Amino acid sequence: MSPVPPTDVLVVEHAPQEGPYAIGTALEAAGLPVRTCRTWAGDPVPDTLGDAAALVLMGGPAAAYEDFSGRTAELALLRAALEVEVPVLGVCLGAQLLGEAAGGRSRPGSGPQIGWGEVRAAPAAHGDPLFAGVPEHLPVLHWHGDTMDLPAGATLLASCDRFPVQAFRLGGSAWGLQFHLEVDKAAVDAFAAAFPDEAATAPDLVASAPRNLAALAPHRDAVFARFAALVADRAERSATRTFFTPKAAKWEARFAADGPRYTAAVLQMGLRPGGRALDVGCGSGRALPALRAEVGAEGVVLGVELTPAMLTATAKEGRADLARLLMADACRLPLADGAVDGIFSAGLINHVPDPAAALREWARVSAPGGVLLLFHPSGRAERAARHGRPLDPDDPLAEENLRPALHAAGWSLDCYEDASLHFLARAVRVH
């Protein structure tokens, strides 16, 4: 099994006039299809993120602190996205729900805030992945009466006098906007038509829209273009984490019988006491005991894994003390050139987006003469038969594909075994 690359961005709408507008335009420009859940039309909120590359929650007339149809399901989606760091963007009600999902509290404000008004960029905005470059004072459209108390660890990005929380970030993947940065002229007209009594409290709402939108548009488009680029860049990572997170707790029990084969494979690396070993895509840490045994107490063992829940599983199995665990992308290792003497990787190379790039990166961090061991506890033919498909001639692990790919990356293949009970390829770093 392997993660399926995300195919779309899930947008949850709560009202017909509160669509994604400029957000949707940016996603489309980045080649990201949008799947819309229109709760206002009776669409059920999905039970899971599925293959979504990002989650966008729009505004609506409901209150985030009151129960409404779909609220529980939306909070569950938000918490799932936060856990696996799938990018999230919440607008107005969506921002308040995001805060609630992370442990904050939404509540009634001091009265409605409707119409055009400035927000002030907070100091943290200048270094934010989305808000960097936004001016200190930005004219935006307000249309809300509620506010929120931010959850612990949130970063404030924008505020105003009446409503101190106007934009915030959670971690490095989730943003909440209380104001309506997404609007264009069609959106302003739709809001005014849907809520005429509220619009009447801001007499210049529609008349001043062209002027305010002209000032807003460059920054609006830049923010959402950055969000779309971030989603596209992290799509594979999002797929991997979404796929493996719910499986992590039972991963070790499911494949416990494979342990001896992992140990036997590690012995083929020829590691020496005091050496430096790296397990890329370490999962629940099944190879870490054998790697530690080979390099001894004076050696170094590193375990790299992209899914946080897998590192939690490693600790649960009592293996966290055997290695230094790093959460990182296998193709962007946080290691110096020549940092390790041996690299072990099980069931990973044929699932990364760019196997050639992975082999080059692993060569970069390997010392001259270092060993790379690619392993799987079953052979290619057995796995293909298990999944009811023929052998793939384009499989990166096929010898006719793997040997030249290794050579191009600076490795020399010196052992290739594709048996029924294991796959093993051993290569040496040559240049």
Annotate each language-model stretch with its function:
Residues 342-354:
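A short SAM/SAH-binding and catalytic strip from SAM-dependent methyltransferases
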Residues 278-332:
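Class I SAM-dependent methyltransferase SAM/SAH-binding core
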Residues 102-186:
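Pocket-forming structural segment of enzyme catalytic cores
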Residues 331-342:
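A short acidic, Gly/Pro-enriched loop at the edge of an enzyme's catalytic core
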Residues 356-368:
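A short glycine-rich, Lys/Arg-flanked "PGG" loop and its adjoining helix->strand segment in the class I
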Residues 24-89:
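Flexible gly/pro-rich beta->alpha loop and the following alpha-helix that scaffold active-site loops
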Residues 235-273, 286-290, 310-313, 371-397:
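Conserved class I S-adenosyl-L-methionine
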